[in-house]
Amino acid sequence: MIHHAAPDFWSSYRSLPSEIQSVADRAFALLKADSRPPSLHFKKVDNFWSVRVGIHHRALGIDIMGGVLWFWIGTHAEYDRLIG
């Protein structure tokens, strides 16, 4: 599975504190190396793909041909509002 990041993802990413950006970098490196690492809770939530970025953050993506397009990353509270 190939992972791509949309411009909106990078906008959300840049608004995160640098320590969370580092956690996100490690999470996505792990995701690219292992398509379903248990620690990331990579799963389908309705029409979205969800991945854990540390304890308090999540990222959302959508299916595209051959992979996932990640469009958002932020706090778990924001995530709950988006998928709620």
Question: Regions from the language model: what does each represent?
Answer:
Residues 15-18, 36:
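Residues in soluble alpha-helical coiled-coils and helical-bundle/repeat scaffolds
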Residues 8, 27-30, 64:
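Short alpha-helical scaffold segments that flank and stabilize functional sites
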Residues 5-6, 38:
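A short alpha-helix capping/helix-coil boundary motif
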Residues 27-53:
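A short, surface-exposed loop/turn module that caps and links secondary-structure elements
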Residues 2-4, 11, 15, 22, ...:
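Enriched for short, Lys/Arg-rich terminal
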